[in-house]
Amino acid sequence: MRLGLIKEDAVLDQNEAFILCDSNGAEQIRLISIIDNGGSALAYKAIRNKNGSSSVCIVKEYYPAQKEDIYKRNKVGEPIFISKNKEKELKIQQENIERELSANQAVYFSVNYDESNSPYVYHSELFTHFGDSSYIVMDTNEGNTLYTVMRKTLTPEKCLRYIYQLLVIVNHLNNKGYLHGDIKPQNIWIRGENENQSMLLLDFGTAMHLSDFQVDVSKLSVDEIFEAADRMKENESLGSMTENFGSLGILSIRNHKKMYRTTDQSYERALALIEAVNNLSVADDLYSVVKVAGELFEKAIMSQEQRDSIEEVLQDMKEKNQTTGYHSVAELREDIEVIECILNNGAHPAVLEKNFLKSRLLTLPDDFTEELLCDVE
């Protein structure tokens, strides 16, 4: 946990409960435990008390990791204060919150904003401002993050079910034109029990609608190209996706933003940054899904033959992730189905071949090499 902020044991201490109230004092939220320490916020599991009833929720407290030297809190329960560049920081904070809530509403509600909302996302809203920080609340049901679930015993079948559910969610976001940007076990919520379990995505802090940033340079003047590159350079969400760091698209953006920030802000560098942003796609979320799949199967209990076979497939998937990437949900699903086939029918063909070759190897006597050298002489 960061120096100067809340210590985890203090949050869990019943005598030092950290409680938030809304502006009217009618609603109260008690923070229970920290579930993630992300790039721009702390996420807490909390209890929301409203109209005499209590419910589980997730609360995000804005606190950017890269600026922790200027975001301070003296002790538990006190507000965060910004020690310098306060006006600028609050403006950035407000922009980030508006972007996150806008993305959440776009993927949560149906087109007509009726009661037919998404089964894959929780509704988020601004709860309150407290000191120099803002708090977003996500309504949830009883459950845990996938990160917590992974501490328990996992069967390979349950791992498969989680991955398939995650692919459905990514496909849902992709169909709406969104990239989540931070898919990881801490941002995946599991509710329900056994066959009734379902999965939802948390935290849209780095989510983006691709059309909001991708531009057609053929329709822009030189000045407009520089203006577009400047907007991309200043936008914190572009290239900051923590779990997607390493994907081809995110690496390209980070590199081109870094080059464009130098004093040599040439036309060519502006074009290169715009092109990198234009190349963002569902592949960058699928990159994270492959990482989650690897973590899940690493924790699963299975036979050694199954583990060897699945690791063979996962290794191929990781190599593809680092080279060409996966460009559609269907493409990644095909490789996951190979793992399902292994679990249902036995070992992967590559593992069977290796075992066959091992069984065909001859055991040579220790003095075989010496005898061979003598024969040559």
Name what the model sees in each region.
Residues Y162-I163:
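Activation segment signature within eukaryotic-like protein kinase domains
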Residues G192-R254, K258:
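Activation segment/activation loop of eukaryotic-type protein kinase catalytic domains
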Residues L42-S102:
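ATP-binding glycine-rich loop module of kinase domains
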Residues N344-E377:
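Regulatory extensions appended to serine/threonine kinase catalytic cores
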Residues F130-T145:
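Conserved short submotifs of the Hanks-type protein kinase catalytic core
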Residues N174-G192:
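Catalytic-loop of the protein kinase fold
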